[in-house]
From Swiss-Prot:
This protein's name: Low molecular weight protein-tyrosine-phosphatase Wzb
Domain of life: Bacteria
Top EC class, one word: hydrolase
Source organism phylogeny: Bacteria, Pseudomonadati, Pseudomonadota, Gammaproteobacteria, Enterobacterales
Active site, UniProt feature: C9, R15, D115
EC annotation from Swiss-Prot or TrEMBL: 3.1.3.48
């Protein structure tokens, strides 16, 4: 059972906070948090990410970016990344995590979710669609696990 889930991207201001809140929407009983490999520590979510999420009735309010660490990783049963290279970086940092690190897009043909940072609103909207689809698929997989 995955009770503690960490979602990881680079800056922890666009993709991972959105994915975190989407998973929380589908599974409010789980502890879902996010962090970044190169986090903009202390920053809130990107304004465009906030706006796009709000269009889907998803709030990123109160988000505060934080840096991932080996120690932090130990607190989670499942760590979900946006890109395959993020898995590699996490496993270099903490080889013992290899068995619990997967792509956020795992159930969507191993889909990697591109970074929309400093890109157009349309890019943010497209990334939101990918995140929402993957979050739904994880929600279904997590439900199946509970049976």
């Amino acid at each position: 059972m995955f009770n503690n889930i960490l979602v990881v991207c680079v800056g922890n201001i666009c993709r991972s906070p959105t994915a975190e809140r989407l998973l929380q929407r589908y599974h409010p009983e789980l502890k879902v948090e996010s962090a970044g490999l190169g986090a903009l520590v202390g920053k809130g979510a990107d304004p465009t990410a906030i706006s796009v999420a709000a269009e889907h009735q998803l709030s990123l309010e109160g988000h505060c970016a934080r840096q991932i660490s080996r120690r932090l990783c130990r607190n989670y049963d499942l760590i979900l990344t946006m890109e395959k290279r993020h898995i590699e970086r996490l496993c270099e940092m903490a080889p013992e995590m290899r068995g619990k690190v997967m792509l956020f897009g795992h159930w969507d043909n191993e889909c990697e979710i591109p970074d929309p940072y400093r890109k157009s609103r349309e890019t943010f909207a497209a990334v939101y669609t990918l995140l929402e689809r993957s979050a739904r698929q994880w929600a279904q997989a997590l439900n199946a696990e509970q049976v």
